[in-house]
Structure formats: C-alpha cells, structure tokens
Amino acid sequence: MVQENKNFATAKAKSIRVSPRKLNLVAAFIRNMKVSEALVQLTFSPKKIAKVVKDCLQSAVANAENNLGLDIDRLVITKATVGKALVMKRVMPRAKGRATRINKFFSNLYITVTEKEDN
C-alpha cells in the first residue's frame, strides 16, 4: 500500500454556544479564502462568533505547520463546515399560567486548510 503525501490539515471546535445559522454566515464568508486574508477579515469582523472561528482557523494553521510541515503562506481554506450539536431546552413563563419552550442551539465547526501551488 502506497501512502499519499497529505497536504491538508484540519481543526474542529465542538459545542459552540451559537446557532448553526449564525455560525454558517461567518464560515461561508471565509470559505475558499487564503488563510492570511481570512485572519484579517475575522479580526475586524463585527460578529461575536468570529473570534471562535479565528481561534479554530489558527489551530488548523498550527496543525498544518507543526504536524505536516506545510508552508503557511500558501494555505487556503478549502472546507469550513458547520453542523448541529445539542439543543438545550428551557422554559419561559408566559401570561395566564402558560409556558413556552426556548431552544438554545449549539454548533460544531470543522475547518480544513490545504496547501495550494502558486500559479
């Protein structure tokens, strides 16, 4: 069996306390972007979740550099996947003795960076 040289690294952030819809806005924004450009965009993004996405991206870059020896200047974000995690169900009291359910969503984030050749 011939082992292929791996030129991608991954990182994940699990059980992030934000809805998948809000997290996917930021993940879709950085998808297919160069890592250096994505870090700048996430640093100055007004979204609160951008800090968590930036930390996960920096972890993926560190994995690529330390574990695989990839060049960080040529890294591109090839995948930024968002998934549903658990849902905490809470009760909110309402008028006339009723109660409604509040759902507090959690998300998972998976980022894959790949080394691209300069063209």
From Swiss-Prot:
A single GO cellular-component term on record: cytosolic large ribosomal subunit
GO molecular function: rRNA binding; structural constituent of ribosome
Keywords: Ribonucleoprotein, Ribosomal protein, RNA-binding, rRNA-binding
InterPro entries: Ribosomal_uL22, Ribosomal_uL22_bac/chlpt-type, Ribosomal_uL22_bac/org-type, Ribosomal_uL22_CS, Ribosomal_uL22_sf
Entry's transmembrane regions: none
Coiled coil regions in record: none
Domain of life: Bacteria
GO BP term, example: translation
Pfam family, one: Ribosomal_L22
Leader peptide range in chain numbering: none
Cited PANTHER family: CHLOROPLAST 50S RIBOSOMAL PROTEIN L22-RELATED (PTHR13501), LARGE RIBOSOMAL SUBUNIT PROTEIN UL22M (PTHR13501:SF8)
Protein family according to the UniProt entry: Belongs to the universal ribosomal protein uL22 family.
Quaternary structure annotation from Swiss-Prot or TrEMBL: Part of the 50S ribosomal subunit.
UniProt function note: This protein binds specifically to 23S rRNA; its binding is stimulated by other ribosomal proteins, e.g. L4, L17, and L20. It is important during the early stages of 50S assembly. It makes multiple contacts with different domains of the 23S rRNA in the assembled 50S subunit and ribosome. The globular domain of the protein is located near the polypeptide exit tunnel on the outside of the subunit, while an extended beta-hairpin is found that lines the wall of the exit tunnel in the center of the 70S ribosome.
Entries under HAMAP family matching the protein: Ribosomal_uL22_B
Protein name: Large ribosomal subunit protein uL22
